Amino acid sequence: MPISSSSSSSTKSMRRAASELERSDSVTSPRFIGRRQSLIEDARKEREAAAAAAEAAEATEQIVFEEEDGKALLNLFFTLRSSKTPALSRSLKVFETFEAKIHHLETRPCRKPRDSLEGLEYFVRCEVHLSDVSTLISSIKRIAEDVKTTKEVKFHWFPKKISELDRCHHLITKFDPDLDQEHPGFTDPVYRQRRKMIGDIAFRYKQGEPIPRVEYTEEEIGTWREVYSTLRDLYTTHACSEHLEAFNLLERHCGYSPENIPQLEDVSRFLRERTGFQLRPVAGLLSARDFLASLAFRVFQCTQYIRHASSPMHSPEPDCVHELLGHVPILADRVFAQFSQNIGLASLGASEEDIEKLSTLYWFTVEFGLCKQGGIVKAYGAGLLSSYGELVHALSDEPERREFDPEAAAIQPYQDQNYQSVYFVSESFTDAKEKLRSYVAGIKRPFSVRFDPYTYSIEVLDNPLKIRGGLESVKDELKMLTDALNVLA
């Protein structure tokens, strides 16, 4: 159900909107004609490649196992009903007969009782001679129900320590100024050399080091000044209150001004004190999986180079204008910072399909999200708050606006060649965070993850003992808060 615009329909408001749209056209520099880079396209290609590989494998396999040195490693599932009293001993006898070496065995109550008979579901990982695989399976089928074999579920590697983000550096290079003839900087050798020099800073960077400073040229500062001055005036009427509050603090404490491009190290320290987020230099657009994994550690991968001077109001790729004006201020809000980290945590070990959906969610929230404040729709997405034209467009009567629903947003077609035709509006950051939490609960992984803010590490919660340990730390925090309430009572 589209959400109607909260702006007045009076003649005065219509004139103002028309004036802003006209100004948008006048301040928008010659537009880069071509696709705008996004995490979604990268995630989609990875998902399609993985699906094709899986289909090819399934077409050639019946009984699924891994072969190693003449042995077959089987992951075997079956169900034994309670009416068959000797079934367990008979099934164990089968494994004994074929001299199967059992590596792992688990049981759980049967999820689907049949004819009022309860039972147990078994998972057995075992090793048996290659020539005995078919006969062993047939023997088990005579005793048990729902017998099937499956591949061991293998998940994509993901960083578990913040230092391992040094391995998350897979760049999407199709819009690189050295490679893309349509890039505004393709015919400018000076710009291309400058980009390479700044990019090398990111390639050499190791997690935990101070971020090296960049001495920006007069031309680069001029590009920054034009965008900064144009957008600063529009923020008072179009940006959400959280962005405005943080932007004022950044001007006071981090050198934000039309005449100065802030240094990432200064901004990173500011964010760390506010929400625990920190910046890390990156040479371009990361792969979706690597970028989202960084968010799980409250690390935002941030470029240091600036767009080409010929196109100050539009860039086909992320640059420091987009990051510093769009992303950084809103990451200074605690609720939004948690929302961003939750997307990152949900991506760890996720399938290619889920990575694509999470990337699309990121697109329609963190990049192009709108929210309600005092009954008025405001912008919080970085893609909006770093683009005069799209910011005016998003809050005009032209696009469709829908209530934020993660299920719908995750599969919504996106626009990477022009302004978005659809935007999603959240009631509040807290509401968006809770809706995301419900959505993430539906992502299929045989484990959950937890971020440890003391060690900057990810704990994989895949057994009751680990979960119990996490609950103990929560219990300690609750006890401390309860004591604090008692002191105030």
Swiss-Prot record:
Question: What GO terms fall under cellular component here?
Answer: axon; cell body fiber; perikaryon; perinuclear region of cytoplasm
The cross-references to InterPro entries, in alphabetical order and at most eight, read: ACT-like_dom_sf, ArAA_hydroxylase, ArAA_hydroxylase_Fe/CU_BS, ArAA_hydroxylase_sf, Aro-AA_hydroxylase_C_sf, Aromatic-AA_hydroxylase_C, Eu_TyrOH_cat, TH_ACT
Gene of this entry: th
Q: What class of enzyme is it?
A: oxidoreductase
Could you tell me the keywords of this UniProt record?
Catecholamine biosynthesis, Cell projection, Cytoplasm, Iron, Metal-binding, Monooxygenase, Neurotransmitter biosynthesis, Oxidoreductase, Phosphoprotein
Q: What is its EC number?
A: 1.14.16.2
* Modified-residue entries (Phosphoserine), positions: 38
Q: What is this protein called?
A: Tyrosine 3-monooxygenase
Q: In which tissues is it expressed?
A: Expressed in the ventral brain, with highest levels in the olfactory bulb, low expression, if any, in other tissues.
Q: Which family does it belong to?
A: Belongs to the biopterin-dependent aromatic amino acid hydroxylase family.
- What is the activity regulation entry? Phosphorylation leads to an increase in the catalytic activity.
Cofactor requirements of the protein: Fe(2+)
Which cellular compartments is it found in? Answer: Cytoplasm, Perinuclear region; Cell projection, Axon
Q: What does this protein do?
A: Plays an important role in the physiology of adrenergic neurons.
Organism equals Oncorhynchus mykiss
Give start-end positions of Low complexity composition bias: 1-10
Tell me the GO BP annotations in alphabetical order.
Answer: dopamine biosynthetic process from tyrosine
Pfam families this protein is in?
Biopterin_H, TH_ACT, TOH_N
Could you tell me which pathway this protein works in?
Catecholamine biosynthesis; dopamine biosynthesis; dopamine from L-tyrosine: step 1/2
NCBIfam families from the xrefs? Tyr_3_monoox
| Residues reported in the UniProt entry to bind Fe cation | 322, 327, 367
Care to name a GO molecular-function term for this sequence?
A: tyrosine 3-monooxygenase activity
Q: Which reaction does it catalyse?
A: (6R)-L-erythro-5,6,7,8-tetrahydrobiopterin + L-tyrosine + O2 = (4aS,6R)-4a-hydroxy-L-erythro-5,6,7,8-tetrahydrobiopterin + L-dopa
User: Which lineage do the record's taxonomy fields give for this organism?
Assistant: Eukaryota, Metazoa, Chordata, Craniata, Vertebrata
In this chain, the stretch annotated as Disordered covers 1-29
